[in-house]
């Protein structure tokens, strides 16, 4: 596979095909997240919370962080594009764009993030000077955080290309509408997920 395909597979995979593979991606991400305690509190955030919640919560969360942005970007595509925009293209490519977060869910199996978080909490919030953590856990947690950052950048790049190609937009208009859609989507998915968490927790 060419490196460019990792950031823009949508020239070859779009429409119903992208939607199908996108659903598979969300299914795998939700299932893996359930076992690794990986949450996605908004469309781009990743959190590892060792808390038992039903599998249905993880699947609904995947739907929320895909459906809301897809709706928002579809509206923005209709506003900005002079050509016809197919619903299935926007929704399909936005679903497929989430495939980097399968890796994020797998990273949740590392307990180092939890131990690092507990250590910082004890040290700075509880002022527990006896708190300890291994060098291995610190290094692993830092590596995981760095990988999370790369995965987030990868996701955003994929979503931009999905929006740009599906809406037939270019240049400043594509960038401006995407940034606006991204900001609104983050806020909207965060608020809905807070409400959902309250229902399941």
Where are these regions (language model features)?
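Membrane-helix interface motif
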Residues: 34-44, 109-122, 195-198
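Hydrophobic alpha-helical transmembrane segments and adjacent short intramembrane/lumenal linkers
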Residues: 89-178, 184, 188
